Amino acid sequence: MAEQIIELEVYLVRHAESVGNVGYGGNAELSVADREDPVLTEKGLRQSELLGQRFKDCPLDCILSSGLRRTLSTVNEVVKAQPENGAKEIEILPSLAETGISHEYSGFTLEELKENYPVKLAEGIETDRMVVSSAGTDDYWNLERANQIWKYIRKRFHSGEKIIVAAHGNFNTSLFLRALNLPPQTGFDVAFTNTSVTKFVFFKKGTGRYGDDIKMLYHNETSHLAQEFPEVTFMT
């Protein structure tokens, strides 16, 4: 059997629990930012800390995130827990935004986000808009958006790097399907629990165990939550 050559390991992460996940308490006076870009709940903040602890002994080469606050707050805890040789900042990839974001919302500016997070725009990306809007689009549009993200990632990382790609429940489905080259009509729902981790390994072309180029090692893995939040883990 030929040697397996790993070019990239990707941890696909969903953000922690946000106010939008649990409801706004009947508040009808929400701003556009609060509606489209909700913050984490207290539970979500703790989930993020536990996610950070999961990666504390895993030095990452890069953390890519959407420009929405719930995702940035989640991976900020990962940055805090990284070892000395791990990732120390978050790179915003605006196209990782959740599906259905309205066109009237462009997100906070990079300078505004820098006040709360160690962020910069992802390498090679030039834009003033930290969030890609997709209201009114269909599954195929979002699948193509996901496809372009994978092309960007595979072109940039191919030397054995380990990276996090942090996004959202709905759009992570598009990323999952395109990574595995699956059609949108799969006949099953792809679940992504808050702070769940799905791991993909990309091999040098033709060197996978069966000649494949990609392997999914695990999906929707939440063992870091098991002790404090057993109700949201696969172990219940």
Predicted features along the sequence, with ranges:
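An N-terminal RHG(E/S)-centered segment typical of histidine phosphatases
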Residues: 1-61, 76, 80, 84, ...
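Acidic, low-complexity terminal tails and accessory targeting/binding regions
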Residues: 1-9, 98-119, 159-161, 177-236
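Phosphate-coordination/substrate-recognition cap region in phosphate-metabolizing enzymes
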Residues: 5-7, 49-126, 208
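Generic beta-sheet signal
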Residues: 10, 161-170
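Short glycine/proline- and acidic residue-enriched helix-loop micro-motifs
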Residues: 34, 115-141
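Glycine-rich phosphate-binding loop signature in dinucleotide/nucleotide-binding domains
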Residues: 57-59, 153-161
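Short beta-strand scaffold positions
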Residues: 65-66, 144, 166-167
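GST superfamily/GST-like fold recognition
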Residues: 168-173, 196
